Amino acid sequence: MKIWKDIFTGDEMFSDTYKVKLIDNVMYEVYGKHVSRTLGDVQLDGANPSAEEADEGTDAATESGVDIVLNHRLVETGFADKKQFTTYLKDYMKKLVTRLEENNPSEVEVFKTNINKVMKDLLGRFKDLQFFTGESMDCEGLIAMLEYRDIDGESTPILLCFKHGLEEEKF
């Protein structure tokens, strides 16, 4: 199993339990689905219900959302406007280039060449995107983007993450 973590915060962003596609060698698209889960009662194996106190019974709580977001405890965040998002992208890209120059100089040109196209595309779709940080909620790290696309007549959630802002860990 592979898990991709934010290189700046160490937060888990997604794993290979989902369909993962690399776009222009700079952006991962992670295909999720909308799920609802019941967060029910805890059952203790071996407990004798007749010897226990009467259970008052509670309504089982449910949570629903995108499986990637729920499973990796991503936290929704936002940008006030496109200008604020653009500022974040420029600052984050500078951090990535600096890190690439230190750790992986052969990737710098590919990154710089392809990232401009991807950034223009993201800015054009700004109003259709949701934004998520990792569990630590550190906005200095990677902010993943989520959009919905119509695939085979179904609205499919797709998480977008910058490849160079992640490290792959195998378990």
From Swiss-Prot:
The keyword Disulfide bond does not apply. Residues 1-171 form the TCTP domain. InterPro entries: Mss4-like_sf (IPR011057), Mss4/transl-control_tumour (IPR011323), TCTP (IPR034737), Translation_control_tumour_CS (IPR018103), Translational_control_tumour_p (IPR018105). Keywords: Calcium, Cytoplasm. The keyword Calcium applies. One of its GO terms (molecular function) is calcium ion binding. GO terms for cellular component: cytoplasm. Its main location: cytoplasm. It is found in: Cytoplasm. Involved in calcium binding and microtubule stabilization. Belongs to the TCTP family. This is Translationally-controlled tumor protein homolog. It comes from Aedes albopictus (Asian tiger mosquito). The lineage of its organism: Eukaryota, Metazoa, Ecdysozoa, Arthropoda, Hexapoda.
